[in-house]
Curated annotation (Swiss-Prot):
Biological role stated in the UniProt entry: Catalyzes the NADPH-dependent reduction of N-acetyl-5-glutamyl phosphate to yield N-acetyl-L-glutamate 5-semialdehyde.
Organism: Sinorhizobium fredii (strain NBRC 101917 / NGR234)
CDD domains in the record: AGPR_2_C, AGPR_2_N
GO molecular function: N-acetyl-gamma-glutamyl-phosphate reductase activity; NAD binding
Entry keywords, A to Z: Amino-acid biosynthesis, Arginine biosynthesis, Cytoplasm, NADP, Oxidoreductase
Positions annotated as active site in the UniProt record: C117
Reactions catalysed, as given in the entry: N-acetyl-L-glutamate 5-semialdehyde + phosphate + NADP(+) = N-acetyl-L-glutamyl 5-phosphate + NADPH + H(+)
Keyword presence, Glycosyltransferase: no
Entry protein name: N-acetyl-gamma-glutamyl-phosphate reductase
Pfam families on file: Semialdhyde_dh (PF01118), Semialdhyde_dhC_1 (PF22698)
InterPro entries: AGPR_type-2, NAD(P)-bd_dom_sf, NAGSA_dehydrogenase, Semialdehyde_DH_NAD-bd
Subcellular compartments: Cytoplasm
Family under the similarity heading: Belongs to the NAGSA dehydrogenase family. Type 2 subfamily.
Length: 308
C-alpha cells in the first residue's frame, strides 16, 4: 500500500513547491484539498487523520492547530515547515546533515520540524565549528543574509511583482527585521550550539529564489591555532560523504558569488573565504530559499521518514 501524504497548505508558496517535487512519484498517494475548501476545518481534520505523513505549510498558529487535530492519532506523522516547533525538545530538527545521528532521528520521529532557510545556512557553517572546538563558548556571532523574495510568501511576491499593489516594493534590495528579534534567531542559537543569540541581519533581493548567508569571524578570537585551512578542514570532515551539502575547495580566487546560482536546486554549497595568514575568515552558505531552505528539505525529511 502506498503511503498517504497530505500537504496542509498546499496552495501556498512552500506547499506548491513541495507538490511540484512530488509530481510523477508513483510511490506516493497524495491527498488533496480543493483551494476553495482550504479553510474547511472538518475536511482538513479528516485529511490530516487519513494521512501517513502530513506536511504542514501553514502559519505558526495554524500549524499548532493542525497538530492538535491529530493529537490522539499515533499513526499520523508530521513535518512542520513553520517556526512553531523548531526549538521544541520533543520534535526532531529536520536538517539531516547537521549531525551524524540526525538522519536516524528524523527517520524514527513522529514529529519533525523543517528548518528555516536562513538557519539552514547559518547552522550549516556554525555547528561544525562548535563541534570541532574551533568556535569558542560565548563568541559574538553575527549572521548577515540575503534571500530571494519568495521567502516572504504570496504577500511579498505580490508586493514586488505587482507594480499596482498598494504597498509595492520597488527597491532592488532592502533590509528587514531591524529590531533584531527575527523569528529564526532561537533555532540558530539552539541548533548552532551557541551560548549567545547571534546578531542576525536579514535582507531581501529582487530575485525570486536564492540565498546567501554569511558568518564572518575573527581568527584571533577562535580556538588557539585556528586558521583558514583548519576551518575548511573541519567543514570538509563534517560533511564527508554527503551529497546534498558541498564544501567548496578553498575559494580565495573566486571573484563573486551569485545568490541565484542554486535556484531550483535542493543542494547547498559552503565556502570559506579569507587570505591565508590573515586575521579574518568569512563563512558563506549558498542555497535556494525554497529548495534546501524549505520544500526540498521537507521532501528529503519525508523520504527519510518513509525509509523507517
Amino acid at each position: 500500500m502506498k503511503p498517504k501524504i497530505f500537504i496542509d497548505g498546499e496552495h501556498g508558496t512552500t506547499g506548491l513547491q513541495i507538490r511540484a517535487r512530488m509530481a510523477g512519484r508513483s510511490d506516493l498517494e497524495l491527498l488533496s484539498i480543493p483551494e476553495a475548501e482550504r479553510r474547511n476545518a472538518a475536511l482538513r481534520e479528516d485529511l490530516l487523520n487519513g494521512a501517513d505523513i502530513a506536511i504542514l505549510c501553514l502559519p505558526d498558529d495554524a500549524s499548532r492547530e493542525a497538530v492538535a487535530m491529530v493529537a490522539g492519532n499515533n499513526r499520523v506523522r508530521i513535518i512542520d515547515t513553520s517556526t512553531a516547533h523548531r526549538v521544541a525538545p520533543d520534535w526532531a530538527y529536520g536538517f539531516a546533515e547537521m549531525d551524524k545521528a540526525q538522519p536516524a532521528k528524523i527517520r524514527d520521529a513522529r514529529h519533525v520540524s523543517n528548518p528555516g532557510c536562513y538557519p539552514t545556512g547559518a547552522i550549516g557553517v556554525i555547528r561544525p565549528l562548535r563541534q570541532a572546538g574551533i568556535l569558542p563558548d560565548g563568541y559574538p556571532v553575527t549572521v548577515n543574509a540575503v534571500s530571494g523574495y519568495t521567502g516572504g510568501g504570496k504577500q511579498m511576491i505580490a508586493q514586488i511583482e505587482d507594480e499596482n499593489h498598494a504597498d509595492h516594493i520597488s527597491a532592488p534590495h532592502f533590509l528587514y527585521g531591524l529590531p533584531l528579534k527575527h523569528k529564526h534567531v532561537p533555532e540558530m542559537k539552539m541548533h548552532g550550539m551557541l551560548e549567545r543569540a547571534p546578531i542576525f541581519s536579514p535582507s531581501v533581493g529582487k530575485f525570486p529564489q536564492g540565498m546567501i548567508v554569511q558568518v564572518p569571524l575573527y581568527l584571533d578570537d577562535l580556538a588557539p591555532g585556528a586558521t583558514l585551512e583548519s576551518i575548511h578542514a573541519a567543514l570538509v570532515e563534517h560533511y564527508a560523504g554527503q551529497s546534498i551539502v558541498e564544501v567548496v575547495p578553498l575559494s580565495a580566487q573566486l571573484a563573486r558569488i551569485d545568490a541565484t546560482e542554486l535556484a531550483g536546486k535542493d543542494t547547498m554549497k559552503l565556502f570559506v573565504f579569507g587570505t591565508p595568514g590573515g586575521a579574518h575568515v568569512n563563512l558563506v552558505a549558498l542555497l535556494d530559499n525554497l529548495g534546501k531552505g524549505a520544500s526540498g528539505a521537507a521532501v528529503q525529511n519525508m523520504d527519510l521518514m518513509l525509509s523507517a
